[in-house]
A protein has these predicted regions:
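Bacterial N-terminal signal peptides that target proteins for export
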Residues: 1-8
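C-terminal segment of classical bacterial N-terminal signal peptides
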Residues: 15-22
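N-terminal leader/targeting pre-sequences
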Residues: 23-152
Length: 152
């Protein structure tokens, strides 16, 4: 019985040692942002998932999803970056990130992955910025609200 207890304690201790490595960014955690249609653009649901792994190969991973949008349409995803302006009240830098194509039901998904070098090239680390995502195509546009993103 004591062998089983010792083995169980070792497994729990090993798992606890692994968990901190999976926590990702200490300043900005993953965020799920709803997309809303601009005007009368069709949309059942949609979102942007902004994930900050903060690693050397994957600094950030964004997932874009449309459900019930225009069918068979190609959309461009653009990140509107408001440098050092977490309220998105000033001028934005438009950063195209991905292309998303919907199927016959108007559903589509795309991803963008940013490494540290890409983020450093923009000179935006160690600050808080406002970001709005837009997805546009076929005369329809979908947008998120402004969110403050702190990059370390």
């Amino acid at each position: 019985m004591s062998f089983r207890l010792a083995l169980a304690a070792a497994v729990v201790a090993g798992a606890a040692a692994i968990v901190p490595a999976a926590l990702g960014d200490a300043l900005y955690h993953s965020e799920h942002l709803a997309l809303t249609p601009v005007g009368d653009a069709p949309l059942r649901s949609g979102f942007v998932e902004n994930i900050h792994a903060n690693g050397p190969n994957v600094y950030a991973h964004e997932v874009y999803v449309l459900n019930g949008a225009l069918p068979n349409t190609t959309y461009g995803v653009t990140l509107l970056l408001h440098p050092n302006d977490p309220t998105c009240s000033g001028a934005a830098l438009a950063v195209p990130t991905a292309t998303l194509t919907t199927g016959v039901s108007g559903n589509g998904r795309a991803d963008a992955v940013f490494d540290v070098g890409t983020v450093d090239a923009f000179g935006i680390r160690h600050a808080t910025h406002g970001i709005v995502w837009t997805i546009s195509g076929g005369g329809s546009t979908y947008t998120t609200t402004c969110t403050a993103v702190t990059l370390d």
